[in-house]
Every structure is written in C-alpha cells, then in structure tokens.
Amino acid sequence: MVITVPATSANLGPGFDTLGLALNLRNEIEIVKSDYTSIEIYGENAEYLRTLKRNYFVEIFMDHYKNLTGKEDSFKFKFNNKIPLSRGLGSSSAVIIAAITAAYEMAQVPYKKDRIINLALSYEPHPDNITPAALGGFCVAKLRKNRVYFLKKFIPTYLRAVVVIPNRTISTQKSRNALKAHYNLKDIVTNISSASMITAAFFSEKFEILRNVVEDKIHQENRMKAVPELFKVREIALREGALMSTLSGSGSTFFNLAYKDDAYSIYNVLRDNFKDFTIKILQFDNVGVKVYN
C-alpha cells in the first residue's frame, strides 16, 4: 500500500486556526506487512529523522491498527518526504492524517474522511491544517464541542502558490507565546472581516478582491519578526502581482497566491532577492490524502 498526503498552508493571514488549503507537495509512505518492523526514510530532513528513537507516523499507525484489529503485526515502512519540517507547511498534520488513514486501510475497515479528521484532533487540536490535509482544496473549519465542522472548495487550476521557505525555522510554540493575551475590538473586527472576505473570494472565485482585503491584526507581524526578511518578501510579492501574501501557518514559510501567469515573475524576483531561501511554484491539491493499493 502507498499513501500520499499534501502539504498545507493554514491561517492565510487573518483566518487564524480556521482557514487552510492544500498544496501539491506530497509525502509518500509505502507500507508492507513483514516478519519484522523496519523503517526507511528518504527526502526532506531524512538524516535528522533517522536519528530519532521514535517515529511519529509509525506510533500513530500502530496504535490505530491495533485498536481496529486487535493485532500487533509487523510492517515495513518506507518514507519519501517532500514536506520540510517546522516550516509552517503542515508536516505534523500530514503525518497524523496519513497515519490514521493508513491504519484504516491496512485494517480494511471502512471510513469516511470526516472520521479521520476528528480522530486527528487527539494529536492536533487545531483543524486548519488537518482538514485540507485530509480533503484537499480550500477549507474553512471550526472546532465545536470536540468536533470539526468544515466546508471545502476546489481551487481553480489557473491559480498557483509561490512559497518562500527560509533557511531557518520559527518554533510553533514560540510563535504562540508571541501572541497577545488580549486584543482590542477594532483589531478583532478587522480580522473577522478579512477572513470573511477571503472565504467569500475562494467560494465565489472572485480572487481580484483579495488584493485589497487581506489584513491581519492578531499574529502575523509579531511572528514575522523572527525572520525579518519576510517583510520584504511580502512587499516584493504584492508589488509583482500576488493576490495575497501571508505567513504560512506559524511560519517560517511565506505563502503567496497568484494567477498562473504572474507566478513566474513573482518567483524570479523573489529568487533573485533571497538566494539563501528556497522558492517554489506549486499547484494546489484538491484531493487530500490518497491511497494506492
């Protein structure tokens, strides 16, 4: 069995812990029953991951597989990772969604993706990454009484993501610690109206309006101070035609939405200005986690 799962970009500026979308940058995991458990890791951060005593995917997979079957079988796991760690591209959510899905598939127990999303809450209490990782597309998600409610919209093929991946990380915990304890009403209203406009733009496919309505007063500015070059990234991307330019999750990656024809000029200028950063043009993923048997 082979399972693939996409990277995700969450928050999208003002949509804190609520908005997210899936990118066509995928981790792939091959799982085969075996006489003994073995793990092979290739791709992004492979050398670091090989040094860890515990494998997060394997632990989650085995827990759910045992719960579903009552068995403690052995498996060969082969990872080919393309999602970088700790860069705000949903690497943890990708692991969680893929592991739970793989357990159900290997146990041959029927499931729906909303079941996978809600099980994932045990490991990731914020639904903005886990939902698009499971479903693909642009997702709006709300957590209420330990249940995720969500809506999904397919992202048109004429759009691209230009992602800027810095050469250093921003710790998610440190990013959350940088948040204020209290916010004034004006800032809260700004975020509500901006997040609402982003949602309406994606569902109506009227993306031009994004150039004028994306504004965050809750988290971005403080988090971006950890990688101050990101302020220049945003300035250049918007100048070169990006529809919106926001921190991806808690960072350090910066997400830029653009029309396909504008993406290449944005990419070229950013690449010339930030030679130590990794710049990628990515299509969007409308499928989410996917299994090949």
Swiss-Prot record:
Cellular compartments annotated: Cytoplasm
Binding site for ATP: P84, L85, S86, R87, G88, L89, G90, S91, S92, S93, A94
GO CC annotations on file: cytoplasm
Record-linked PROSITE patterns: GHMP_KINASES_ATP (PS00627)
GO terms for biological process, alphabetical: threonine biosynthetic process
Coiled-coil annotated spans: none
Main location: cytoplasm
Broadest EC class assigned to this enzyme: transferase
GO molecular function, one term: homoserine kinase activity
Pathway: Amino-acid biosynthesis; L-threonine biosynthesis; L-threonine from L-aspartate: step 4/5
Record field: catalytic activity: L-homoserine + ATP = O-phospho-L-homoserine + ADP + H(+)
Enzyme Commission code(s) on record: 2.7.1.39
Pfam families: GHMP_kinases_C, GHMP_kinases_N
Keyword annotations of the record: Amino-acid biosynthesis, ATP-binding, Cytoplasm, Kinase, Nucleotide-binding, Threonine biosynthesis, Transferase
InterPro entries: GHMP_kinase_C_dom, GHMP_kinase_C_sf, GHMP_kinase_N_dom, GHMP_knse_ATP-bd_CS, Homoserine_kinase, Ribosomal_Su5_D2-typ_SF, Ribsml_uS5_D2-typ_fold_subgr
Known role: Catalyzes the ATP-dependent phosphorylation of L-homoserine to L-homoserine phosphate.
HAMAP family, per the entry: Homoser_kinase (MF_00384)
Family statement: Belongs to the GHMP kinase family. Homoserine kinase subfamily.
Protein name per Swiss-Prot or TrEMBL: Homoserine kinase
Organism (species): Nautilia profundicola (strain ATCC BAA-1463 / DSM 18972 / AmH)
